Amino acid sequence: MLAPCSGWELGCFRLCLRQVRLWAGAGRWACWACQARPYSSGGSERWPGSETEVPPPGPGRRTLKEWTLQVSPFGRLRARLPCHLAVRPLDPLTYPDGDRVLVAVCGVEGGVRGLDGLQVKYDEDLEEMAIVSDTIHPQASVEVNAPLKFGLDIKSSGSGCVKVQSIEGDNCKIETEHGTSILQSVKGQKLHVQTKGGKVICLGTVYGNIDIHASDKSAVTIDKLQGSSVTVSTEDGLLKAKYLYTESSFLSSAAGDITLGSVHGNITLQSKMGNITVDSSSGCLKASTNQGAIDVYVSQLGKVELKSHKGSIIVKVPSSLQAHLQLSGKEVDVNSEVHVQEMAEVRKDDVVTVTGLMNQASKREKWIKADAPKGTVSFRRQSWFQSLKLQD
């Protein structure tokens, strides 16, 4: 008898769907979502993240084939699959030496083709665990338990989704075509995620030097990123992050909006067509958009430079902030609740420039510069408590 597919596979995706729905609004899931149970609301059943598009669960999925291989604890996993893949660490109590890889293929019994073409092997010289197939059914799923410090090199084709949970290898590389990539509580020196048409979702805290690129209409949603260097880019999709704790971050989108919660460090934001929103900035912030609007709360100041070529800018600050101000736009509105000393106004070529000081700022590097030549610059007071947006 073949055992049922592990509860971790289904349970973790139920958790992901709940978190994604609450934070990311991720919409339709093409992968394991169809296996999770619907939940009831108001007497009717609904699916997390999509009320109409996700099909009802099919017959029970079972473990169809299993492998256990002895490996180096510091090797790497190379996977090339057209189906779903989930990777998590070995149980340290069961495998204290961390020298095994467990592989299981799950699917509807008798309904998964291409198992004979699935290669599962370990190369001792390269210290590389390979899982490769181009014939396995796209609705199958491969579950891997690997050593905690394993590196990852994963490519999925078609609609194959990838989830990596709690792995701490030096290098983690994930590439998908149309499947969703999920990183949950992952640590590494270098983390690279790329998708041509799927979503990228980071749950918990993801540590490392991080590079995420999402093409076409792919969205990127993030709980928390922490590391020295972070680069995240989208084309037409939303880029949304709750927390960034980095030395240097560069986030960009061609046409999608950039929506950030609390950010710390040197942050650069660029969007050609989309809007930029930052709930709280602590450090240096440089944000620019061609046609979109900018809305920023500056909680602690390094140097802030904001530019919207055709849109408007809203800058919110606490009353205690010390800063030099230079606000330029077709119109400039400084709220009366903000006390600005030495305020001066200059008009030239249909552009108004207002300069001044907040709270007798003495350090010249503490600047807020906002430039919206075709729009309005609004400067207003907001408390830190208001920035938390608890009503949401």
Swiss-Prot record:
Q: Please list every transmembrane segment annotated in the UniProt record, as residue ranges.
A: none
Can you supply one Gene Ontology CC term for this chain's record? mitochondrion
What superkingdom does the record give? Eukaryota
Pfam families referenced in this protein's UniProt entry, alphabetically: DUF4097
From the UniProt entry, list the residue stretches annotated as the region Disordered: 39-60
Q: InterPro entries from the entry?
A: Toastrack_DUF4097 (IPR025164)
Give the matching PANTHER family: PROTEIN FAM185A, PTHR34094
Protein name as it appears in the record:
Protein FAM185A
Name of the gene: FAM185A
